[in-house]
Regions:
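Conserved catalytic-core segment of nucleotide-activated headgroup transferases in glycan assembly
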Residues: 17, 21, 134-198
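Membrane-proximal helix-turn-helix segments that form the acceptor-binding/catalytic region
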Residues: 87-105
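A charged, aromatic-enriched C-terminal amphipathic alpha-helix characteristic of glycosyltransferases
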Residues: 269-301
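Acidic donor-binding loop of glycosyltransferase active sites
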Residues: 206-219, 232
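N-terminal pre-catalytic "stem/leader" segment of glycosyltransferase-like enzymes
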Residues: 1-63, 249-253
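Conserved acidic donor-binding segment of nucleotide-sugar-dependent glycosyltransferases
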Residues: 248-258, 265-271
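Active-site proximal beta-strand in glycosyltransferases
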Residues: 49-54, 64-84, 106
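Donor nucleotide-sugar binding/catalytic pocket of nucleotide-sugar-dependent glycosyltransferases
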Residues: 103-117, 121-138
């Protein structure tokens, strides 16, 4: 199957398997051996499948144009399924109409599938797994993992305050990656990592013993996935596939901070529980998220 990707990015061609910044859509492109085009480009050949991310500033993007050179056209979810409801009403309607005109809707989680099926009554909504292109990582150093890292800062999008309260209940020092929406005074409570590309991030994450990511904004779930690949137990909220499938013993109901505190205490004080969660995360990553599993939802296209 020949696949093309259409986004607002300006380059044309394929992403190498060793790309240093292998974010979600790049990983999809690599796994599908897809050629990338800017959404304004006109390919000089016909593709079996075209996948596009609906532009935020132009949600009325004309999928009929893509159908001229793609036998089927799919839209890829980006961000939480409710994100478009912060658009103007006009653009919300345009976004909805673009969704319904696609042949396939690819989504991140089982809960997203339920949402989009109900919203659009679309007959072909598929969960397309998040994945990691492991070639890009290279060799990891043997390190003695220490401390705790959270998946985001102090904004509601990342649920950073929830994560901090849980992490700080067992660890005096809490580390977090620097995010785009930085809050004044964050450095007084947490150690912020500098901005880094995806490869650098994986190598840095490998130094930590426990992950906490109590993020209510469910999308691709890369933090829980990255932790699972490394065998780092990660505490997170229910509703995110990567969290539930890779860290089932560490998944709590949204808002159940008390249960999360109990889990981090047990991880920190019971080597038996920690080692079991670590082993389980690695094994379940291989079962659910290795690259070979990714293409299973393309059958029948």
């Amino acid at each position: 199957m020949e696949v093309a990707f259409f986004t607002e990015m300006g380059f044309h061609g394929k992403i190498p398997r060793t790309h240093n910044n292998m974010r979600t859509e790049f990983a999809w492109m690599v796994a599908l051996n897809a050629v990338h085009y800017n959404i304004k480009d006109v390919p000089n050949k016909i593709y079996d499948l075209g996948i596009t991310i609906i532009p935020k500033n132009n949600p009325q993007f004309d999928l009929e144009k893509l159908k001229k050179y793609c036998n089927k056209v799919a839209v890829m979810q980006e961000g939480p399924h409710w994100y478009f409801q912060d658009y103007t009403l006009e653009n919300q309607i345009k976004y909805y109409n673009t969704l319904t005109s696609a042949d396939i809707i690819f989504v991140h989680n089982k809960t997203d599938k339920i949402y989009y099926e109900g919203l659009t009554s679309h007959s072909d909504v598929r969960v397309m797994r998040s994945l990691m292109i492991e070639d890009a990582i290279g060799s990891l150093k043997e390190v003695e993992r220490q401390g705790v890292i959270t998946g985001g800062n102090f904004v509601s999008w990342y649920g950073g305050f929830d994560s901090y309260i849980v992490a700080n209940s067992q660890f005096e020092q809490v580390t977090a990656p620097t995010m785009g929406r930085k809050q004044e005074g964050e450095e007084q409570l947490i150690t912020l990592l500098p901005y880094m590309n995806w490869k650098e991030w994986i190598h840095k994450l490998n130094e930590f013993k426990i992950g906490v990511h109590l993020m209510r904004t469910h999308a691709a779930g890369t933090f829980a996935l990255n932790c699972a690949y490394l065998g780092i137990p990660c505490i997170g909220y229910k509703g995110l596939d990567t969290q539930e499938q890779c860290h089932p013993e560490l998944t709590v109901e949204v808002g159940n901070i008390g249960h999360a505190k109990e889990l981090i205490k047990e991880l920190n004080n019971s080597s038996e529980f920690y080692n079991e969660c670590s082993r389980q995360a690695k094994e379940r990553y291989k079962v659910h998220y290795e690259e070979s599993k990714f293409k299973s939802n393309l059958f029948g296209i």
